[in-house]
From Swiss-Prot:
Encoding gene, per UniProt annotation: folD
Binding annotation for NADP(+): 170-172, 195, 236
Catalyzed reactions: (6R)-5,10-methylene-5,6,7,8-tetrahydrofolate + NADP(+) = (6R)-5,10-methenyltetrahydrofolate + NADPH; (6R)-5,10-methenyltetrahydrofolate + H2O = (6R)-10-formyltetrahydrofolate + H(+)
Family listed: Belongs to the tetrahydrofolate dehydrogenase/cyclohydrolase family.
Official protein name in the record: Bifunctional protein FolD
Keywords per UniProt: Amino-acid biosynthesis, Histidine biosynthesis, Hydrolase, Methionine biosynthesis, Multifunctional enzyme, NADP, One-carbon metabolism, Oxidoreductase, Purine biosynthesis
Function text: Catalyzes the oxidation of 5,10-methylenetetrahydrofolate to 5,10-methenyltetrahydrofolate and then the hydrolysis of 5,10-methenyltetrahydrofolate to 10-formyltetrahydrofolate.
Pathway: One-carbon metabolism; tetrahydrofolate interconversion
Native source species: Anaplasma phagocytophilum (strain HZ)
Keyword tRNA processing recorded: no
Any one GO BP annotation for this protein: purine nucleotide biosynthetic process
Amino acid sequence: MGIYENNIIDGKAAAADLLGRLKVVMEGLKEEHGLFPSLVVIIVGDDPASRLYVGNKQRKAEELGINSKTIALPYETTQEELLGIIQELNEDENVHGILVQLPLPKHIDKILIINAIDPEKDVDGFHNANAGKLLTGEMDCMVPCTPQGCIYLIKKVMPVLSSKRAVVIGRSNIVGKPVALLLMYENCTVSILHSATANIEEHCRDAEIIIAAVGKARMVKSEWVSPGAVVIDVGINLITSESKNRFVGDVDFESVRDKVAAITPVPGGVGPMTIAFLLVNTVLGACRQKGIKQYKNIKSSVLQ
């Protein structure tokens, strides 16, 4: 199956295609500049889902040739201890990307930790400095990974986004707000829908692009979407039953898929793209930190 077949956008195939191009670029950077990008992921506590995510990130990084290290800390780690580790990594010229896996234990201030990371090494793109640059349209910054993945997948089936009507369901700092900005920079007409939005179904029916990132299982129904729409499902919700547990998205996939032009599945849609863009950010961050000026051209060649 290719990236797009039978109305389904295959995020795994899209990520593999993107990472294949990134690997070629990395080989050139190693030969020409002696650049070996390095990523450090910090995880605090024993959350099984977080450990699974971190394992997937490290495996993909190693497959690509990125030096990847995981620092696993006990739940009892203090905020001061975590800040100290981050400061050491900030000062280490051989570390190009730092990621603190969320969620963090309640006794640690997430915002403080995110903003302790050097913005140039903030591969998640969550630091206030990066968020501020994105808000003002200064794209020479770390852009959050999942929003980048959403736009990449949309463009695989809808190459020209200018003038398209788009809705984003959800207004989080991680997905909703940044993906709305990216759509706006593509000259879409964007509406952000949330818990206080009246007639949410009507807004969705009027949209040519729907991005669901609200964390409510199967919220978007068939009657919410118009024929020919492109639907990107960011949600991942655990459904438990006596027979088995499984993950579903924010979109009722089975009822929606035959009505729309394209839809991402859960799992296997946006998730692989998030990891792919984490690695893209790591390589681009390494280029910036090492003063490799053609990194903008590198980004264009990877994202073609």
